[in-house]
Regions:
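Non-transmembrane, aqueous-exposed alpha-helical and coiled segments at domain scale
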Residues: 1-184
């Protein structure tokens, strides 16, 4: 609650979940780059994308359905089969501040407790055309800034792994036979 108001928060069931290890990998990679760092926001977005591409995805629906124990086991599995190799590829070694955190089970346990405590604030939806039709206006949360779009290479490597403009909202609507009529 904020100011006595509890907003309605919806999430597409299949939305990707960023894990604490995604965040730690991102921060560790930035630290390993030294003066050549990319200037990341530190939220692990690119690491989430990379993990999903590698076949270790995690959806909002899964996180909601699983018990704390099941989620913790899945995160441990990802750590054992993906995170260690990814950390090595990013140059995160024992001298890196984040190396130890990437092996600390308490970090995962705390993440799981926080995620499970807060995921209930979301209403999971299959945002199809019928469901969307109940709303007069849709608000799409977007990326970090137009100049950081993954396809705008003028500032490479200082980009995000996403499209930050109207591309994703327009694509989302198009898949449902809807159009983007106004953008503010």
């Amino acid at each position: 609650r904020l100011f006595g108001f509890l907003p309605l928060l919806y999430s597409e069931k299949t939305a990707r979940v960023t894990t604490i290890d995604d965040v730690l990998l991102n921060m560790g990679a930035e630290a390993a780059r030294g003066d050549a760092r990319h200037g990341s926001c530190g939220m692990g977005i690119d690491e989430c994308v990379q993990r999903n591409r590698a076949g270790y995805g995690l959806s909002v629906e899964e996180v909601t359905a699983w018990s704390e124990t099941e989620l913790l086991e899945r995160l441990r599995e990802i750590r054992a089969h993906y995170t260690r190799e990814r950390a090595a590829a990013l140059g995160i070694d024992r001298a890196n501040l984040y190396f130890e955190l990437l092996g600390n089970d308490t970090v995962l346990q705390n993440y799981v407790a926080e995620v499970k405590a807060n995921i209930g604030l979301l209403s999971l939806v299959d945002a199809n055309r019928d469901w969307l039709s109940q709303f007069e206006h849709l608000i799409f949360e977007s990326g970090q800034g137009l100049l950081l779009d993954e396809d705008y290479e003028a500032y490479a490597p200082h980009l995000t792994s996403s499209k930050t403009g109207l591309h994703n909202p327009a694509l989302f609507l198009e898949k449902r036979g809807l159009t983007l009529d106004e953008a503010i």
